[in-house]
């Protein structure tokens, strides 16, 4: 799990990073990775990666002076409405409201 997190964090801004690339980097099959990940987490790898990206975006919005668009793109989100929807679902505020607070 630690190695998975390290690889995912290293690739947060890469909107093209895939599960297949993760498997290659970890030298495991997709099936092995899904099984192992599911046994220690209640999320899929894709959901976990999205959560990491959202938390990084939240951090950037509160500390870096980035606007919402910059934070979304810096964390691998290409679609701003998708980013806003997922941010709201994760944190209970849309990213613009959150940004205004900081």
Predicted regions and their residues:
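Short coil turns linking two alpha-helices in DNA-binding domains
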Residues: 29-30, 78-79
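Core residues of bacterial helix-turn-helix
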Residues: 25-26, 37, 75-76, 87
């Amino acid at each position: 799990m630690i190695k998975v997190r390290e690889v995912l964090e290293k690739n947060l801004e890469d909107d093209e990073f895939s599960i297949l690339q993760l498997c290659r980097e970890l030298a495991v099959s997709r099936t092995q990775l899904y099984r192992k990940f599911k046994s220690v987490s209640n999320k899929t790898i894709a959901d976990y990666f999205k959560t990491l990206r959202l938390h990084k975006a939240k951090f950037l919005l509160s500390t870096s002076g980035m606007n919402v668009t910059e934070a979304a793109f810096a964390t691998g989100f290409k679609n701003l409405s998708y980013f806003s929807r997922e941010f709201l679902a994760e944190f209970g505020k849309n990213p613009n409201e959150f940004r205004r607070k900081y």
